[in-house]
């Protein structure tokens, strides 16, 4: 092996080339690689954060859904209680109204019965007077004998 000037020139050129690459080419390449690694790491971290945020959002949505269901069930239960209360109040009002109408009807029936009895007494008294007139064959003056008529009506 001959070490001649060509080999020595090539070695010097190679060393200069390596120095030039290390000084001017290698740092931008390393910066680009490091920047790319950083972006990839940030992207992975963002993806992890997004997954965690998604899990938290799902948990929060589940909790809100449970709360909404509980609130809805509570509202439905209150509505059912209120419905039962309204139905009970309506039944009580209807019973009171029915009792009032029955009492009013009975009072009207009693008043009508008393009026009919009184009419009947008067008619019987009139018939009795007419019968007595025919029996006695004389006229009885109602004004003069009103006490007799009143006693007769009271007895009937």
UniProtKB/Swiss-Prot annotation:
CDD domains for the chain: ATP-synt_Fo_b
Compartment(s) of residence: Cell inner membrane
Highest taxon in the source lineage: Bacteria
Keywords on record: ATP synthesis, Cell inner membrane, Cell membrane, CF(0), Hydrogen ion transport, Ion transport, Membrane, Transmembrane, Transmembrane helix, Transport
Coiled-coil residue spans: none
Main location: membrane
Topology versus the membrane: Single-pass membrane protein
GO molecular function, one term: proton-transporting ATPase activity, rotational mechanism
Gene3D superfamilies for this protein: F1F0 ATP synthase subunit B, membrane domain
InterPro entries (UniProt xref): ATP_synth_B-like_membr_sf, ATP_synth_b/b'su_bac/chlpt, ATP_synth_F0_bsu_bac, ATP_synthase_B_chain
Annotated TM spans: 13-33
GO cellular component: plasma membrane; proton-transporting ATP synthase complex
Family: Belongs to the ATPase B chain family.
Quaternary structure annotation from Swiss-Prot or TrEMBL: F-type ATPases have 2 components, F(1) - the catalytic core - and F(0) - the membrane proton channel. F(1) has five subunits: alpha(3), beta(3), gamma(1), delta(1), epsilon(1). F(0) has three main subunits: a(1), b(2) and c(10-14). The alpha and beta chains form an alternating ring which encloses part of the gamma chain. F(1) is attached to F(0) by a central stalk formed by the gamma and epsilon chains, while a peripheral stalk is formed by the delta and b chains.
Reported function: F(1)F(0) ATP synthase produces ATP from ADP in the presence of a proton or sodium gradient. F-type ATPases consist of two structural domains, F(1) containing the extramembraneous catalytic core and F(0) containing the membrane proton channel, linked together by a central stalk and a peripheral stalk. During catalysis, ATP synthesis in the catalytic domain of F(1) is coupled via a rotary mechanism of the central stalk subunits to proton translocation.
Name of the protein this chain belongs to: ATP synthase subunit b
């Amino acid at each position: 092996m001959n070490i001649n000037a060509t080999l020595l020139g090539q070695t010097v050129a190679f060393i200069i080339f390596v120095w030039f690459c290390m000084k001017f080419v290698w740092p931008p390449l390393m910066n680009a690689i490091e920047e790319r690694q950083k972006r990839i790491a940030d992207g992975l971290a963002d993806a992890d954060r997004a997954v965690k945020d998604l899990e938290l959002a799902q948990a929060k949505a589940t909790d809100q859904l449970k709360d909404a269901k509980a609130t809805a069930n509570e509202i439905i239960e209150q509505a059912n209680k209120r419905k039962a209360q309204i139905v009970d109040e309506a039944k009580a009002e209807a019973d009171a109204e029915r009792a009032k109408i029955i009492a009013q009807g009975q009072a009207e029936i009693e008043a009508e019965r008393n009026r009919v009895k009184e009419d009947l007494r008067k008619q019987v008294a009139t018939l009795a007077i007419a019968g007595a007139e025919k029996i006695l064959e004389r006229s009885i003056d109602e004004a003069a004998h009103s006490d007799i008529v009143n006693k007769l009506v009271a007895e009937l």
